[in-house]
From Swiss-Prot:
Organism: Prochlorococcus marinus (strain NATL1A)
Record membrane topology: Multi-pass membrane protein
Taxonomic lineage from the root: Bacteria, Bacillati, Cyanobacteriota, Cyanophyceae, Synechococcales
Chief site of localization: membrane
GO-annotated biological processes: heme O biosynthetic process
Gene: ctaB
PROSITE patterns membership: UBIA
Keywords tagged on the record: Cell inner membrane, Cell membrane, Heme biosynthesis, Membrane, Transferase, Transmembrane, Transmembrane helix
GO molecular-function term, one example from the UniProt record: protoheme IX farnesyltransferase activity
Record-given protein name: Protoheme IX farnesyltransferase
């Protein structure tokens, strides 16, 4: 009985079981290769970077050019990633039916599409935003395709720790789009995404470790096992919580309100991290942490924007005044 239970807990799952929308929505081949499900979170952290600037909110045309250019660059990065990894995808049952391995799209059409997206993205950002935002966006694209996909991913179990820089660049793009420079707030959100990424991705890697093992990709769960991975996730989870609260001090306004609203997000994150550390072989716990980690980062960016609303700023100032009056009463 114990043996059968263990097999049930550790049985590998498909990505479709982790992200239920994959079951319901069959994407066209041309849309599948650009990995559209990854783009919304990248745009959310871009907006988060904007909200940390004194110049928030941005004029609508500049906001549209920033998000449009970012989405196109992310699409190009996704397509180039699919091109690079098509041989690996052929060898994994989970990915063998993707557009390139199955022959539904040709390599040349995907490459041309990626180049077109990159050129239009750069044109939008240079003409509608600024050269710094355009340069950072191009840096993010190159770091994802060259640094992470081509160099780090097949060589080291710490690939996502260093390769995570690609996913952390959008806050820098947002900050530079708003102010023309990055600033302390942009660097803070960049750092937060960097430390959040390993905990987020390794939870997924636990679920898909057999896929990675079958093609020789040295993800941490395949190299060191789920127990070591769960401990590493715990370290990065606590770092994420610590860094997230520093946002109280880098927000131009509304920092106290942001910190208060962040409490339940961090409490839930630590709860799920602890549950996985207690039983790293329970795939339901890894799945729960992976899903929550996505909502967590969306939530942080949402709170950054909410904290910059005028009504939030007024409420934040009233809270500070109340705390001061309360402290004076005890002095």
């Amino acid at each position: 009985m114990v043996s059968s239970t263990s097999e049930l807990i550790t049985q590998p799952v498909n990505r479709e079981e982790v992200v239920p929308s994959r079951k319901r929505i069959k994407l066209p081949a041309w849309l599948e290769v650009v990995k559209p499900r990854l783009i919304p979170l990248l745009l959310a952290t871009t907006v988060g970077g904007m909200a940390l600037s004194e110049e928030w909110p941005l004029p609508s045309p500049r906001l549209a050019c920033t998000l449009g250019g970012g989405a196109l660059a992310a699409a190009a990065a996704g397509a180039l990633n699919c091109l690079w990894e098509q041989d690996l995808d052929k060898r994994m049952k989970r990915t063998s039916n993707r557009a390139l391995p199955s022959g539904r799209l040709s390599q040349s059409s995907v490459f041309i599409g990626a180049v077109a997206c990159t050129l239009v993205s750069s044109a939008l950002l240079v003409s509608g935003v600024n050269c710094l935002a355009a340069g950072l966006t191009l840096l993010g694209l190159c770091s994802y395709v060259l640094l992470y996909t081509a160099f780090l991913k097949p060589r080291t179990s710490q690939n996502i720790v260093f390769g995570g820089v690609a996913g952390a660049i959008p806050p820098l793009v947002g900050a530079s789009a708003a102010a023309g420079h990055i600033g302390l707030g942009g660097w803070w959100l960049f750092s937060l995404v960097m430390v959040w990424t390993p905990a987020h991705f390794w939870a997924l890697a636990i679920l898909l470790k057999e896929d990675y093992r079958s093609v020789g990709i040295p993800m941490l769960p395949t190299v060191s096992g789920p127990f070591v991975t769960a401990k590493a996730i715990s370290v990065y989870g606590y770092l994420t919580v610590f860094l997230s609260f520093l946002g109280c001090f880098v927000l131009p306004e509304g920092g106290l309100l942001y910190g208060i609203l962040l409490l339940p997000y961090n409490s839930r994150l630590l709860q799920l991290v602890s549950r996985l550390r207690d039983n790293p072989e329970d795939l339901d716990r890894a799945k729960g942490l992976f899903r929550w980690s996505i909502l967590y980062m969306f939530g942080v960016c949402f709170l950054l924007v909410i904290s910059r609303l005028q009504v939030s700023i007024v409420f934040n100032d009233q809270l500070i005044a109340l705390i001061k009056d309360f402290s004076i009463g005890f002095s």
